[in-house]
Amino acid sequence: MNDAPGNGADFVREGKLDTQVLIVGAGPVGLTLANDLGRRGVRCTIIEQKEAPQFLPKMERCNARSMEIFRRMGLADKIRAAGLRGDVPMDVFVILAMDRPPLLHLPYPSVDQARAEVAASEDGSMPLEPYQLISQYTLEPLLKAEAEKLSSVTVRYGCEFISAAQDEGGVNATVRTLDGKTETIRAAYMVGCDGGASPVRKQLGIKLRGEGNLMRLSQALFRCDDLFDRIPIGAGPGKGRHYHVADDKATFLIMQDSTRHFTLHSVVESDEEMKQRFEVVVATPLDYEMLSCAEWRQNLLLADNYRHGRIFLAGDSAHLVIPTGGLGMNTGVGDAVDLSWKLAAVLQGWGGQNLLKSYEVERRQIGDRNVGASRYASGGRRKWRSQYRPEIGKDSPAGEAARDNLAAVADLEQRKTNEMIGAELGYRYVGSPVIWEEPGGPEHLFRTYEPTTWSGAR
């Protein structure tokens, strides 16, 4: 199929297209794509089956590379203002409970401290923007509001993707609105940003391959207004971001972006058991409300293809990772901005025939790399958790030995999750049809970043 239909704006004006790009799925990836296309003057429509953004804590951190991208879009300061305040420590703990001395304390800089380090660095070894703790239920409405400000972007919630057919000139997508009526939207290109269960990917017959259903956990969102202010509780750990519980249920507590909301992950059989786990971990009487509880599965999967004709995949529709390392949504943001400028170039007449071909070449290798990075990180956490022994909480020589052993292993292995700057910044596009290829090149590691001017690197 021809990549270049001419000037897409002319097609819209002539009535041949309803929109230049149809985006299916208004999560953070789809909304990032809509915002970037809109800022480039590309007419796009983004549809979402849900009636409104949901209050669900699917992600909780924009990494350094995503914040650099949002800075370029003029959104970084708005995201920081909406997220966790900059003075809160990002420390990580391994604990028995919140009222007992931590087994391990891994200190990490707050956003304010990280920004000061960035400002003081002049050798290119630091990102332009450090990370920002912000939950998806905060980020999504922010990106939606920004997209709605752009005259070239149409945002439609309560609009479900049903099917699509493509021809030489575009894509005809059938959608269904809340009242049950169907309509056809014609676009030059379509992008499926519709999550791991992606109806777009399934219709295209593109398979996900890798390791699926590795583990089942439940995730609950709690509101507890007093917990953050009460920390430290007795001899317990100080204020931080993650509290990993040394138990046989893979339990960990995460502070979300308001200091009043926390998520708890654990292997449980019921909502009531999840409440009990929260009380055991917090270990002090506090008023709380469990706002949601749902099961999720750990997957390490990659789509065979990121494109079929005029239809593309981005985000979780193309790759699924375990949240360890924070490479899910953040990888999708990279997909969105790589595809955005290429679609704009072709639609506006200054991009050549090979430009859109480069999207899959470039981004699928990063998806594959980040699936590997997630495997590396989750393997580290699995390794230290395997050191759990039932006597670990006992005041006895055997209990002390169990605590010391687990802490020593966690001190090595938990860092694989929390120190991933190389995976965030150090990737390089190899074999792209639009990048000059040189043999060799630097080796990029997951945990460390070395700045380079090698072609295809950040």
Residue ranges and their predicted role:
Residues 157-171:
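A conserved short coil-to-beta-strand element within the FAD-binding core of flavoproteins
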Residues 17-19, 179-189:
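Core beta-strand elements of the Rossmann-like FAD/NAD(P) dinucleotide-binding domain
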Residues 25-34, 143, 192, 290-376:
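Conserved mid-domain beta->alpha element of the FAD-binding
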Residues 344-457:
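C-terminal helical "tail/cap" subdomain of flavin- and related membrane-associated enzymes
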Residues 145, 189, 193-300:
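Conserved FAD-binding catalytic core of PHBH/FMO-like flavoproteins
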Residues 38-59:
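Glycine-rich FAD pyrophosphate-binding loop
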Residues 55-58, 62-146, 245-246, 256:
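Active-site-adjacent segment of FAD-dependent monooxygenases/related oxidoreductases
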